[in-house]
Amino acid sequence: PIQITWTGYLDTTGLKEIDYIIADPFVVDKEQENLFVEKVWRLPDIWNSFSQPNYNIKVGMLPAISNKFVTFGSFNHLNKINNSVIKLWSTLLKKIPKSKLFLKYKSLNIDYYKNSIVNKFYNCGIHQDQLILEGSSPREDLLKTYNRIDISLDPFPYSGGTTNFESIWMGVPILVLKGKKFISKCG
C-alpha cells in the first residue's frame, strides 16, 4: 500500500513508511524537499481544501464603521498564541488607538485559561478592556462571529488552517507573518 500524509500535521512525519506528503509550490518549495522523509507531492494551486458551510450567513458591514475602533481577531487554538505572538499583537494594539483583540476558542470557557491570557497581555501593556474573550459555540454561531471583527490575525510560527479559510469565507482579511516552514506558510 501507498501511505500519504496531509492536513493535520504540516511537517515531515519522519517515518520512512509514509510515502508522500501533499503540499503545493508555496508551502514547500524545491529547496525544502530535503527536509522531508516523504516524497513531496505538490498540487498545482493549493494543498488544502475548504467546503462551503451549509449555513446562509451574510457577510456583515465592517464593524469599525459603527464601533469607531478596529477589532482584530483570532479564533485559533490557544496553543498557537505563544509569548512572541502576544508580544507582537500587543505592540499592534498599542499602535492603533482604541483597538481591541477578540480571541475565541473553547479553552476560553475555562477561567484558568481566560485569566492566563489576560495576564500575558497585561504583562505586555494591554488592559483587559482591550480584550474580548469568548469560548466555544456551534459552528454556525462561530462563523457569524466573524462579522464582529475587522481583521483576523494569524498566529506564528504555527499558522491557522481551517480558521483562515473560515475568515476569508466570511469576508475578513487576515494579517499574516510568513514563516520558512510548511507549518508557518498556511496563512
Describe the residue ranges of each PLM region.
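Active-site-proximal region of nucleotide-activated glycan assembly enzymes
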Residues: 1-62
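Structural detector of well-ordered beta-strand residues that form the stable sheet scaffold
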Residues: 1-5, 22, 102, 154, ...
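Glycine-rich, histidine-containing beta strand-loop boundary motifs that form or position
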Residues: 6-8, 105, 162, 178
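Short, glycine-/Ser/Thr-/acidic-enriched flexible segments
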Residues: 11, 26-28, 47-48, 77-80, ...
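Alpha-helix C-terminal capping/helix-to-coil transition sites in glycosyltransferase folds
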Residues: 17, 145-148
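Conserved catalytic-core segment of nucleotide-activated headgroup transferases in glycan assembly
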Residues: 46-138
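Short acidic active-site motifs
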Residues: 140-142, 163
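Catalytic binding pocket for nucleotide-activated donors in carbohydrate/polymer assembly enzymes
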Residues: 147, 151, 155-187
